[in-house]
Amino acid sequence: MALTVTLPMFRSVHTKHHSSTNRPEVDPDMDVGRSPGWLRPVWLLSPLWTYRSRYYGQGWARTDADRRAQVVLDIATVSGILAAVATGHGLDLLVVVVVPLVLSLALLTLAFDYVPHWPYDSTERFHDTRALPSRALNVVLLGQNYHLVHHLWNTVPWYRYQQVYRETYDGLAAAGARVDWGD
């Protein structure tokens, strides 16, 4: 996402997600979960357009400067794409920028938006996201398999999610949180 959104835009969208998790009309990350299963591979790329439509269309920018910065980045991105194609470097752009962006965005959307919140059936604090305990996933996803910890205590740094999960497991389980693969 770093190539397509500014930090203020991401911060705004992420804050809105935390304040309205799994609420279809507001949560910007719900779009991938609501898509038909056969379209999900395409919808894994939905942040490219849904974040913008909500950021611009619903006035989520915190300041005019934040909005202008995103507009400048969007214009620069489109201009760069057009320039690459016009100068015969479309294939280079595809191989060096577009394919890596699509693959990384699909993985990030799957790991951060879809899997942690599936089945999108609750807006309750302890039920709107889950933890998927796994040492391997902890390494590959930089702790986001413990996304439940991120939602409950968003000031905890990602590298402590697993530790906090272990320390709070009994309390989380008692509260009915989705703390295991089968929940």
Residue ranges and their predicted role:
Residues M1-V99, T155-D183:
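Non-catalytic, topology-defining segments of multipass membrane proteins
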Residues T6-F10, V99-T123:
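Transmembrane alpha-helical segments that form the membrane-embedded catalytic/substrate-channel core
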Residues F10-R23, D113-W118, V140-V156:
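Histidine-centered catalytic micro-motifs
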Residues E124, V139-L142, Y159, D170:
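Juxtamembrane C-terminal module of membrane proteins
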Residues G90, A106-L108, V139-L141:
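Short hydrophobic "helix-edge" motifs at membrane interfaces and signal-peptide entry regions
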Residues T123-T129:
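Short, surface-exposed loop/helix-turn segments at secondary-structure junctions
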Residues M1-P8, L103, P133-Q144:
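Membrane-embedded alpha-helical segments that form the functional core of polytopic membrane enzymes
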